[in-house]
Regions:
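Divalent-metal-activated hydrolytic enzyme cores
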Residues: 1-35, 69-75, 82-87, 101-173
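Divalent metal-coordination and catalytic microenvironments
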Residues: 19, 41, 65, 94, ...
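N-terminal short beta-loop-beta anion/metal-coordinating cradle
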Residues: 21-25, 30-57
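Short hydrophobic segments within beta-strands
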Residues: 42-44, 95, 159
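Pocket-edge structural micro-motifs
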Residues: 43, 66, 172
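Gly/Ser/Thr-rich loops at beta-strand to alpha-helix junctions
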Residues: 45-48, 98-102
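Short helix-loop-beta junction
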Residues: 56-64
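Ordered, amphipathic secondary-structure segments that act as subunit-interaction surfaces
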Residues: 87-97
Length: 173
């Protein structure tokens, strides 16, 4: 058991100040956890991606699941079970993107880079790098479609988001 540390207010002062302004203009108190548009998006954590803007939606419309590389992991599947059975999701868009670091090298490259930059041995972690984005997208979509705890009626599609043009390019999966 560790002793709780005080919140590092000085390091997060910009975040807390912005939240104060957000609270003053907040108008979403009537939203529920239900996805109004019945959509979940699995995408990357890359800060160039604004999932709601990309698909023309707003808060309350979509469930957004993010991780490095937009990979369909065990945790993504767990979350989709909740989203489909309890929160109104009937369709899933798996949306990796161009210029993704997870698609620019293999596991050993990532481990080596982290070790060089930080001196940390990360070989105990599997980063789920991607050697071919399109092939991996097809495989990840298939993983959702084949997961026995998800509804058979769930519609799943894949598209690659271009971070330089903003365009979604659909992929036959």
């Amino acid at each position: 058991v560790t002793t709780p540390r005080p919140f590092p207010t000085d390091v997060f002062s910009d975040v807390l100040a912005a939240n104060g302004q957000y609270v003053g203009a907040f108008q979403d108190s009537g939203l529920t956890g239900f996805a109004r548009q019945g959509l979940a998006i699995v995408t990357c954590m890359d800060s160039r991606i604004d999932p709601l803007a990309i698909v023309g939606m707003k808060p309350g419309d979509v469930k957004i699941l993010r991780n490095a590389g937009a990979r369909v992991t065990e945790d993504v599947l767990r979350t989709l079970v909740l989203a489909t059975h309890l929160l109104g999701v009937g369709r899933v868009l798996v949306m990796p993107h161009t210029d993704c670091r997870m698609a620019k090298g293999d596991e050993s490259d990532i481990h080596r880079l982290i070790a060089e930059r930080s001196g940390v041995d990360t070989t105990s972690i599997h980063f789920a790098t991607v050697s071919n984005q399109q092939d991996q997208l097809v495989s990840d979509v298939a993983a959702i479609r084949g997961f026995e705890l998800l509804p058979a009626s769930l519609v799943v599609g894949g598209a690659i988001y271009d971070v330089h043009s903003g365009k979604l390019s659909t992929v036959s999966c």
